[in-house]
Amino acid sequence: MLKKGIKKLLLVAMLLTCNMAAWADDEVFSYEGDHYVINVEALHPDSEMTLMDVLLVCPNFVTYDGRNIVGKYELCVDNVSHIMDIESFTQNVKASELKEIHIYNFGSVSQGSNGQYGVIDVYYNTPAAPGTSGKVAIEGSTYGNGKLYTDVTTSSENVVVKGYALTSLKYGKATTDEVDYFRSRRVVENAHFSLKWDISPKDNLMIKANQKFYNYKEHSHIIEDDKMYNIPVYERYGNFVAKYSRILNDNGAEFCAEACGDYLNLHEGELKIRDTYPYCYAEFHFPLFTEDLQMMVGWEIDYDNYWVIDYNRQQYLENQFYMQLNYSHGPWNITIGDRFNHFNHWSHSFNPGDDEFRTSNSKNINCFQTSVGYKVNRHLIQGSFSHDFYLPTADETYLDISAFERRRFYPKTNTIWNTEAMYTYQHKNIVSTSSVYYSWRDDSYLPEEQKVGFRTSLTWNAGAFRLTAGADYYHVNLKIVGLEDKIYNNCINLKLAPTLLLGHGFRVSSVMLYNNKQSLSLLPSHLFASVKVNKDFGKHLNVYADFRDIAGMPSFTILNLQENYYNRALTIGMTYRF
C-alpha cells in the first residue's frame, strides 16, 4: 500500500511538472507603452472562469465588491464603450470566450481618458468555424432578486453577429441607526447588437447598437426627520456606433474612423435631464522611417448638449488632435504622446433673471503621456508618467443645484499628474507584479488630492488549483477649500481569490476583498466575501450556488445601503450552452 501511495504522489508531481513546463513560454501580461494586455489564453481558463475572475488578476484593484467595476474604469468591447449592466455582464461572459483584455491606466492620449479614468477594453475570440452558439443563464436569490441573461453569436466566413439581452430585478430592505424603514426595487433591462463584417481582406466594418432601461423606486423613513421619502428614478439610454478600418499596406499602416451618437433621458424625483452626445474621430497608424517606430495620428470632434430641465443647459464643442509615438527595439519599449484639445463651452440658465450665470468660454488644454519599459527574460521594469488637464463632467456640477455661486467660474480646467514605476516577473505558472505610484490632482473648488502608494499582486496556477492575491496600500492627503486643516488617510485594500477544480465537474471558488476605509469620509471598513460552487451536467448545463456577504456594512447613509445590502444573499442559478 505504501509503495502504491508513493507511486501516486510521484505521478501527480510529474503531471504538475509537465503542466508547468508546457506553460513555460506563456506570458499572461504584455506591455504596449500606455497600457498592458492580459493574454487570457495564457491563464488556461476553465469553462466557468468569468470575466470578473480575469479582472481580479489585474495588479490594480478594479473591483471592491466582486461584482462591479470601480467607477474610475470605463468598460469597452472592441475599443467601443459597452453599455450593459456590469454585474450581469462580468459574471456571465466566460474567460474561454475572450482573446485578450487591454487595461489603460495611462490612456490620456490614445483613449482620451484625461487622467481621471482608465479603460478596460475586451476582445473576443474569433469563431473557429461558421455557425451559431450562445448561452442562456437564469438565477434567483434572497429578497426575491432574479436575473435572466442570454447571448447569441452567429458567424459566417466574413460576418460575425453577436447579440446580448438581459433583465435584472432586485428588491431590498434594511434597518440602520438612522433609517428604521428602507425598501427599494431596481429593474434593469439591456439589449445589445453588434456586427463585424470583413468586407475584404483589408477592409472591416463594425456596427453596434445599445439600449438600456433603468427603473428604481425607494421608500424610506428617516428617524431624525420623522418623514417618509419616496425617490423614483427612471432612465433610458440609447447608443449607436459605426466604425470602419482599412489596412493601407503590408508595412502595418492602417486607417480607422468611428461615428457615434448617445442619448439619455433621466428622471430622478423632480429632476429631469436630457443629454445628447454625438462624436466622431479619424485615426492613422503607420511606421515612421523604420518598423520599430510606430506613429498614431488622430483627430476627434465631440458635441455635448446637456439639459437640466427648468434649471440649466450647458453645451460643449471639443476639437481634439492627438499624436503618439511608440518605439520598440530589443528589450526597450518607449512611448510618448500628446493630445491637444480646443473646447468651447456655453451655459444658460432657464431663469431669465439669472444673466450672471450665463457663461461662454473657449480654452486650449492638452494631455501628455510617456512611458519607458525594459524587458530581460522574465523580468520587466516600466515607468509611466502623464500630465493632464481635464474638465469636470456635467453631472458633477450641474446636478448640484445649490452651487450657483461656483458655476459662474465654470468651467475651469483642472490638473492631474500620474506617475508609476512597476516591476513584473513572469515564470511558468507564476506572475508577480509590484509598483509604486503617485498622483496629484487639483480642481476649481473641490479637494486638492495627493496620493502615494504601493501595490503588489501574485497569480499562481497549478492546474487544478489557482490563487490570486494582492494588496494596495496608499496615503492620501486632502486639502479642501474652506478648511484650514488637511485631511490625512492611510488606506489598504486586500484581495484573495482561490479556485479549486474537483472531479466529476465540481468547481469551488471564493473571493475575499477587504478595505479599511470605503471612502475618505471615514466610513468603516468592510470585508466582502463570497463562496461559489459550480457543477457541470454534461457539456451544456452548469448549475451553481453562490453565497455572498459583507462584514462591517456601513449605516451612515442610505446611499451606502443601496450599494451594499444586496450582497447579503444566497444565489442559485444555471447556465445552458447551445
Give the location of each predicted region:
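Short strand-turn segments of transmembrane beta-barrel domains in outer membranes
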Residues: P127-T154, V179-S184
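Short acidic/polar hinge/loop motifs at secondary-structure boundaries
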Residues: V80-G107, T150
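N-terminal periplasmic accessory domains that precede
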Residues: L51-V54, S88-F89, I103, S113-A137, ...
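Gram-negative outer-membrane beta-barrel transporters
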Residues: P331, Q426-Q518
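Outer-membrane beta-barrel signature, preferentially recognizing the C-terminal barrel domain
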Residues: N230-I247, E356-K375, H379-N461, I487-N490, ...
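Flexible loop and strand-edge segments within Gram-negative outer membrane beta-barrel domains
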Residues: K170-N190, K196-Y279, A403-F404
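C-terminal beta-signal and adjacent terminal beta-strands/loops
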Residues: W23-A24, V533-F578
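Signature of Gram-negative outer-membrane beta-barrel scaffolds
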Residues: D292-V376, L380, L391-P392
